[in-house]
């Protein structure tokens, strides 16, 4: 089963500052629907941004990328000699009553990854088992900024035929570290729950205001506004394992 790490950072203020510095955030989903109508409200309020990928490292994101706790715990979890961090990205969510789909993360192969290969093709390569010899084992850590209404993570450490475990409540400044490429996991419903799931267009943006709140703006319309600690904020870290 994955490891739950607590009190990952001495202070979460440095992460809050990073989130502000690297705003705005845009809706998840462009990779599978690049020709989507930019005026159709088809996306949940699930916003994302890359802080580290193959050609880019956002200033300050090294606190995640080179996190000693993640690296040492990954070595122990996998009994590995080398942990090579390569990706950090942010998910910010609100008003998603149904949560997300149960899934495993996309695999990474020698020469093939999400930077140069469509996600659907990576999934086909994974589930065909024809490319197992070329797959690079991945360690994943998911860190949460705060406790919010709902927003738990369900995961299936014993396989999808067994009941899931849920990490919910007391999530602030914790991280779940393990194999999200082999273990099914799912974001639970995310509140607030008064108005159901609110959809936005692919052009929507989430960004901070001068009043210390965060606002979703969609074609100049203010869709939702709340303090940052009312949003479900998670930061994902991934590393090659050798």
What do the predicted segments below correspond to?
Residues 32-42, 103-105, 109-127, 194-224:
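Charged, glycine/proline-rich intrinsically disordered loops and linkers
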Residues 51-53, 104-110, 156-161:
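Short, surface-exposed, charged loop/turn segments at secondary-structure junctions
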Residues 112-114, 119-149, 177:
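Short, conserved beta-strand element in jelly-roll/cupin
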Residues 88-90, 141-143, 235-239:
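A structural signal for short, well-ordered beta-strand segments
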Residues 137, 148-242:
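Catalytic core of Fe(II)/2-oxoglutarate
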Residues 57-62, 127-130, 162-164:
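Active-site rim elements
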Residues 1-80, 89-93, 97-100:
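Non-heme Fe(II)/2-oxoglutarate
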């Amino acid at each position: 089963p994955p490891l739950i790490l607590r009190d990952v950072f001495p202070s979460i203020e440095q992460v809050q500052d990073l989130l502000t510095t690297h705003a705005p955030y845009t809706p998840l989903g462009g990779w599978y629907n690049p020709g989507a109508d930019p005026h159709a409200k088809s996306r949940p309020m699930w916003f994302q941004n890359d802080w580290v990928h193959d050609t880019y490292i956002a200033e300050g994101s090294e606190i995640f990328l080179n996190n000693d706790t993640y690296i040492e715990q990954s070595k122990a979890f996998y009994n590995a000699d080398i942990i090579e961090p390569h990706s950090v990205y942010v998910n910010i969510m609100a008003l998603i009553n149904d949560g997300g789909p149960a899934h495993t993360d996309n695999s990474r192969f020698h020469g093939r990854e999400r930077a140069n290969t469509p996600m659907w093709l990576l999934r086909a390569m994974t589930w065909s088992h024809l490319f197992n010899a070329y797959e690079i084992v991945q360690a994943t850590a998911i860190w949460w900024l705060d406790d919010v209404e709902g927003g738990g993570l369900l995961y299936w450490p014993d396989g999808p035929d067994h009941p899931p475990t849920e990490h919910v409540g007391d999530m602030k400044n914790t991280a779940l570290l393990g194999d999200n490429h082999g273990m099914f996991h799912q974001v639970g419903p995310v509140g607030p729950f008064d108005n159901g799931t609110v959809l936005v267009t692919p052009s929507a943006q989430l960004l901070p205001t001068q009043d210390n709140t965060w606002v979703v703006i969609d074609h100049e319309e203010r869709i939702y506004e709340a303090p940052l600690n009312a949003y479900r904020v998670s930061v994902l870290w991934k590393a090659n394992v050798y």
